[in-house]
Regions:
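Amphipathic alpha-helical "lid/sensor" segments that cap RecA-like P-loop NTPase cores
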Residues: 49, 53-116
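Short, flexible helix/strand-to-coil boundary loops that buttress conserved ligand/catalytic motifs
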Residues: 23-24, 52, 86, 176, ...
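C-terminal leucine-rich, beta-strand-based interaction scaffolds used for sensing/assembly
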Residues: 115-192
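Conserved nucleotide-binding/hydrolysis micro-motifs of P-loop NTPases
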Residues: 15-19, 43-45, 89, 187
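Sensor-1/coupling segment of RecA-like P-loop NTPase cores
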Residues: 1-28, 34, 38
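Conserved AAA+ ATPase "SRH/arginine-finger" region at the nucleotide-binding site
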Residues: 36-47
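Helical mechanochemical/support elements of P-loop NTPase systems and associated helical scaffolds
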Residues: 16, 48, 81, 127, ...
Length: 192
């Protein structure tokens, strides 16, 4: 019973932004107005490079800053996936890491996740899938007739519903400037 705890501070965090906002901002939820909401920025590439390179060095293995950066870039600085890819790369490295090792680890990680991603896709409509593919392809102007036709999204009025549905499923984030981004970088790569 959290209500009875005294002199305690809690930090609840996660990458499912829509779900977290709902938990703390929805009147019907148990944590309504429970505390402050802070949006943290992603860890910067340069910090990942230093961290990954140092962790390899700490265990007697070598990885160049370029390859450490490649790991962070492939995972778009997403903390969970950057650490997963780093671990998979580290496990495959005996002494010195190569680009081939990073790529092998990346492909293996995507392969491990493919069943999960297939289950996600199976829960979506064909237009929701097409919308996600368009987002993964970097589309920003969804009202363009060419885009609507190419991705078979229906009418421009349908875009609002597609955004809402995929946002509620925590598949996308809508960033400042109304930029749409797929939350999961591994899922985004898999979609392509």
């Amino acid at each position: 019973h959290w209500q009875t705890h005294t002199s305690v501070c809690y930090c609840l965090y996660g990458s499912k932004r829509h779900m977290l906002l709902s938990i703390f901002n929805d009147y019907s939820m148990p944590f309504y107005k429970f505390g402050d909401i802070l949006f943290l920025q992603k860890i910067e590439r340069k910090d990942w490079v230093a961290f990954i390179s140092q962790r390899f060095a700490d265990t007697g293995k070598q990885i160049s800053d370029e390859l450490s950066g490649m790991i962070a870039d492939k995972m778009k600085n997403h903390p969970y996936y950057t650490q997963q890819l780093s671990q998979q790369t580290w496990l495959r490295t005996s002494k010195e890491c190569s680009e081939a090792i990073v790529n092998e680890a990346f492909n293996s990680l995507i392969g491990q996740l493919s069943l999960l991603f297939t289950n996600i896709i199976d829960s979506l409509t064909s237009r929701q899938i097409s919308f996600l593919i368009a987002v993964a392809d970097g589309v920003v102007n969804f009202s363009s007739k060419d885009i609507l036709k190419h991705y078979q999204l229906g009418t421009s009025a349908n875009i609002k519903n597609l955004k809402k549905a995929t946002l509620e499923k925590d598949l996308i984030d809508i960033l400042p400037g109304n930029t749409i981004e797929i939350q999961d970088p591994a899922f985004e790569y898999w979609l392509k």
